[in-house]
Curated annotation (Swiss-Prot):
Gene3D superfamilies cross-referenced by the UniProt entry: HUPs
Protein species of origin: Fusobacterium nucleatum subsp. nucleatum (strain ATCC 25586 / DSM 15643 / BCRC 10681 / CIP 101130 / JCM 8532 / KCTC 2640 / LMG 13131 / VPI 4355)
Location relative to the cell: Cytoplasm
Protein keywords: ATP-binding, Cytoplasm, Ligase, Nucleotide-binding, RNA-binding, tRNA processing, tRNA-binding
Function recorded in the entry: Catalyzes the formation of N(4)-acetylcytidine (ac(4)C) at the wobble position of elongator tRNA(Met), using acetate and ATP as substrates. First activates an acetate ion to form acetyladenylate (Ac-AMP) and then transfers the acetyl group to tRNA to form ac(4)C34.
Membership in a protein family: Belongs to the TmcAL family.
GO BP field: tRNA modification
Entries under InterPro entries matching the protein: Rossmann-like_a/b/a_fold (IPR014729), tRNA(Met)_cyd_acetate_ligase (IPR008513)
Residues where ATP binds: 9-22, 103, 154, 179
Protein name per the record: tRNA(Met) cytidine acetate ligase
Amino acid sequence: MFENVVGLIVEYNPFHNGHLHHIQEIDRLFEDNIKIAVMSGDYVQRGEPSLINKLEKTKIALSQGIDIVIELPTFYSTQSAEIFAKGSVNLLNKLSCSHIVFGSESNDLDKLKRIATISLTKEFELSLREFLAEGFSYPTAFSKVLFDEKLGSNDILALEYLRAIKTINSKIEAYCIKREKTGYYDDEKDNFSSATYIRKILLDSNEKKENKLNKIKNLVPEFSYKILEENFGVFSCLSDFYDLIKYNIIKNCSELKNIQDLEIGLENRLYKYSLENLKFEDFFNEVLTKRITISRLQRILLHSLFNLTENITEKVKNEVPFVKILGFSTKGQKYLNYLKKSKNYNERKILTSNRNLKEILNEEEAKLFNFNELCSQIYRIKSSYINIGYPIIKKD
């Protein structure tokens, strides 16, 4: 009945023309498809709060052709590429996706599959850890193990998706499409500009509102522009959370050593410089070292705020505790109803509301669900948005 159930792993921070191209390419590749997006919620993989909240992002995604939006919980969305990818692929697997389509700079799937297979060997893993221990970033370390094979940021994520598919023995079939013109950090000013460039415009404190909106108008679809315009003035960035981060570091200094991804000794720098700096930028630059990338430090700061520990990461690393549906279209609803008839439906842990949690989740899974809800509540402290509830339903 549903042959082409296609998964996307996205952040939509914010949704731009390149994302629309991704969706259109899926429609070109697969007729009569169901598109399921695993989407970072209120926090993204670079270790930052999402520019706009997850419910607004869900509205945009549904308006542009996505059929089901699944939240990628914070304990996956703010992690390294490996954990981010594995959690995402596991979620798509829970909803029986037949395919996954991702962007790639190289657009060479055979090459990426070969590298993914090699990268799962013990020899590769040992070499990778050696380079990481020397202070190289994950993408650079990965490249060095491959004798300086040049890989773009999207190629690295693509490799992690392929590795995850192999690791969990998923039947999902991978497709890649050419990443249109821009890389993760590109400042290209054509109609396929990157999310990084668009955020840079919107968060520029030296520009007037009208100028910012004019600059992005041709870079995002019309409905995305409308939502961004409505949310103008309440865009979230990490510096907004500095007082909360600082409070938590000072209050829980002795517990910081248990925080996910924290290097030994870094807890002392966090404590020392949080006491000495009133401004986030000064604090951040003092803590930053050559051994830590900007994104990694941002992730560590969020983990300290949430108290996201190594113990929590170990619990969710190999098995997703729940599947939270943020929204769906009429077609998406039909697919969800179809899944309800499957024999293993209860094992999928699908949540379409906060009701009946005790009937669906066990005690440990419920704790992890509540942890993710707490992270969103912290986001709402600074973003001034009201939780209107989920799922968001788009009638076709």
